[in-house]
Amino acid sequence: MDNNFLKYLSTAPVLLTIWLSFTAALVIEANRFYPDMLYFPI
């Protein structure tokens, strides 16, 4: 049971979903604290 669950967690779609959720949360929180950081007017 535990081995199958760990094997499921290590599949590519699950890892991709977890990684994209983490990245999105990081960008959203950075944008909340520093709102003008996401674009650089050059």
From Swiss-Prot:
Gene symbol of the encoding locus: psaJ
Pfam hit, one: PSI_PsaJ
Cell compartment(s), UniProt: Plastid, Chloroplast thylakoid membrane
SUPFAM superfamilies associated with the record: Subunit IX of photosystem I reaction centre, PsaJ (SSF81544)
Family in the record: Belongs to the PsaJ family.
InterPro entries per UniProt: PSI_PsaJ, PSI_PsaJ_sf
Transmembrane segments: 8-28
Membrane topology of the entry: Single-pass membrane protein
Keyword annotations from UniProtKB, A to Z: Chloroplast, Membrane, Photosynthesis, Photosystem I, Plastid, Thylakoid, Transmembrane, Transmembrane helix
Gene Ontology cellular component terms for the protein in this record: chloroplast thylakoid membrane; photosystem I
Job description of the protein: May help in the organization of the PsaE and PsaF subunits.
Protein name: Photosystem I reaction center subunit IX
Species per Swiss-Prot/TrEMBL record: Guillardia theta
GO biological process: photosynthesis
